[in-house]
Curated annotation (Swiss-Prot):
This is Membrane selenoprotein. It comes from the Eukaryota. It is a multi-pass membrane protein. It is found in: Membrane. The chain crosses the membrane at residues 74-94, 102-122, 144-164, 199-219. Keywords: Membrane, Selenocysteine, Transmembrane, Transmembrane helix. It comes from Dictyostelium discoideum (Social amoeba). One of its GO terms (cellular component) is membrane. The gene is msp. Residues 12-63 are annotated as: Disordered. GO terms for biological process: selenocysteine metabolic process. Residues 30-43, 53-63 have a biased composition (Polar residues).
Amino acid sequence: MSLFNLPKVDLGEDCEGGVUARPSSSSSSINNASDESTPLISKTNDEEKANIGISSTSNSPQEEQTKKPLFISILTLLISIPALVGSUCWPVLIASLSGVAVSAGSVELAHSLTFAITLSILSNLAQYHFHKCKKRPSDRGHWIKFGPFYLTAIAVPLATFDILRHILVDNSIWTIHSFISPAAYRPGCENENITCLSVMGWFSAIVFTYTGYACLLVGTIWAADLIPKIKKVWTQLRPSKKN
């Protein structure tokens, strides 16, 4: 065997002039660590984006649940403005303000439509408050948990009593010959205003109506937790007092 008959060695692309550059172990470990940390960082960013998306989507239903009963109560109050001023329904109020004569059939139809709309809105709002109150914590007692529902449920018959009285009188179901007269004004009183209201008129047009809508307003504010939210916003907007 000749001394010059040596085996060929593959120097590779990184070898020049017989000198090979070997990668150091520290640089390879750094590269491996960076490669491993890259997917972790991307995964963390994806999780943060997902959490932000979940929080944003979770806040929107809560805001909708808060605004929904408030809008319904405002709509109900707008419908009931005539009842609060003693005209029972919008057509009668508009006709009295404009000086236009309204037929008896139109008044009866207006009474029926107003009663149907008001009863449907208030009853559905009471059901909504009941299902919402079931999700409230019960550690503070039964009344604190279901108080908004009870107030709204009380508001349903009180706020619709005067309109129902008008419908019963229009259809001659409740007459002055009944055991309790449905007349809202005293006999012989010429002016149909608050000074001429009878006992029935005071209870139906004033006591029942205003108490019903007061219960509705308090129940809606209570169910939506508006007082704590207003206090929180107020404390955030107030400048901090420096000692």
